[in-house]
Design a protein with these regions (language model features):
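Von Willebrand factor
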Residues: 1-14
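Active-site-adjacent betaalpha module
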Residues: 3, 17, 21-126
């Protein structure tokens, strides 16, 4: 791949995730650590499900990227929402199913992949 980027979820004490879901993950720096070597590739921070924000879109446009290969955790929320957002912006987004996972099990992962097949096209789930 010519361009590789990472995203990192950062939660806050007053976030919607804490307030409405009582989810306190990723509040601490240790919980937000990227555990593989990023090899100095860009890291974009986010505090919502989607990785799509102005900073990422600016990077995509600056580098003239038209095809995006997406992987990550959790398939049924962050990956799904990011794939939908990129699809709606007109990008060819391929979800690398074997490089995605769900912390709530394989069944939810597979359900998310089925939803993605239906909504962005089965040929984009690889």
């Amino acid at each position: 791949y010519d361009n590789i980027v990472f995203t990192r979820f950062i939660n806050f004490e007053d976030s919607i995730f804490v307030k409405k879901l009582n989810w306190s993950g990723c509040l601490q720096e240790e919980d937000r650590k990227i555990v593989i070597d990023t090899k100095n590739n860009p890291i974009f921070d986010k505090s919502i499900y989607s990785s799509v924000n102005k900073e990422l879109i600016d990077y995509i446009e600056k580098n003239k990227i038209t095809e995006i290969y997406l992987c990550g955790i959790d398939t049924e929320c962050c990956v799904l929402k990011t794939a939908f957002d990129l699809f709606e912006l007109g990008y060819n987004v391929y979800v690398l199913k074997d490089y995605c996972a769900c912390t709530h099990g394989v069944e939810r992962h597979n359900n998310a992949l089925d939803i993605l097949r239906r909504n962005i096209g089965k040929e984009y789930i690889v």
